[in-house]
């Protein structure tokens, strides 16, 4: 069982991701803001972080930058862009920015499960 942090401001998306992850046997932490998500990442060092890009306080791009600049174990966390940004080039932009992978919404269940499992230690 892995610990996965879901940072998502939309309650329905956060609930769905949580449900899918728990059904797969994972412990789920959740945050509705980047600030809280970063704090949880630092405190708990989850095995994986699913980070929405369009968060209300700090966007996911800046949140990733803060995580990567922490150094040590926090900087090494696996972080997936989890976003409704699904235009041509968005995936490449996310990977170039340092995300470990990219999941678009609405969620494709098989892709979601495969991506999560591929990134877990």
Residue locations for each model-derived region?
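Short hydrophobic/Thr-rich beta-strand motif most characteristic of the beta2 strand and flanking loop
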Residues: 25-32, 40, 103
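Acidic catalytic/metal-coordinating carboxylates
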Residues: 12, 33-36, 59-65
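Conserved acidic carboxylate
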Residues: 8
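Two-component/phosphorelay signaling modules centered on CheY-like receiver
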Residues: 11-29
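C-terminal output helix
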Residues: 107-116
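The feature encodes the CheY-like receiver
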Residues: 56, 87, 105
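Short amphipathic alpha-helix used as the core "switch/output" element in two-component signaling
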Residues: 39, 61-75
């Amino acid at each position: 069982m892995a610990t996965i942090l879901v940072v998502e401001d939309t309650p329905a998306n956060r609930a769905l991701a949580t449900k899918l992850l728990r059904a797969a046997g994972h412990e789920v932490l959740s945050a509705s803001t980047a600030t809280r998500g970063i704090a949880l990442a630092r405190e708990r060092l989850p095995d994986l972080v699913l980070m929405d890009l369009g968060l209300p306080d700090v966007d996911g791009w800046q949140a990733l930058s803060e995580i990567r600049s922490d150094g040590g174990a926090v900087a090494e966390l696996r972080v997936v862009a989890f976003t409704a940004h699904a235009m041509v080039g968005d995936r490449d932009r996310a990977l170039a920015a340092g995300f470990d992978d990219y999941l678009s919404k609405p969620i494709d269940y098989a892709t979601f499960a495969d991506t999560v499992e591929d990134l877990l230690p």
